[in-house]
Amino acid sequence: MASAPTFDNNEFSTAPGDSIRNRVLTDPLETGSVVKLYTAAILIDQGIVTPNTMVDCENGYAVVNGRRLHDSPGHYLGMAPFREVLRWSSNIGIVKVAQELDNDKWYEYLQAFGLGRPTGVDLPGEGSGILYPVGRWTRLSRTSLPMGYELSLT
């Protein structure tokens, strides 16, 4: 586990307070595309997609729920099987398919994965991350969450 800024263990008493905090445990981070794997697992478990389900990724640009989305240059997909949506980390593909999820069920799955609470690792200062309850979700949450935004992990 690594954290920055660092300090010299031999000079601990002179280390600035901020440098001795273990940011990996304490600081919530929006992990972005890592959460696409959680979203994919939920979609597959719910029977919404299979690895071979074709998804229209609209050649890299789309508007979903009033939000303009784009994929990384060089990773633009048209019609593609869901497994390629994951392989190329398509924002558009994952967001479009995730629109089929029920909010309450989605939240239950994210909680079951342990998001929004400490892992219980035996290290001091572990934060819980952030997973807002469904009542705080907005129309844009349905486009942010599948891509790993509006939630954070420690």
Q: Residue ranges of each PLM-predicted region?
A:
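Beta-lactam-recognizing serine transpeptidase/beta-lactamase-like catalytic domain environment
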Residues: 1-33, 38-154
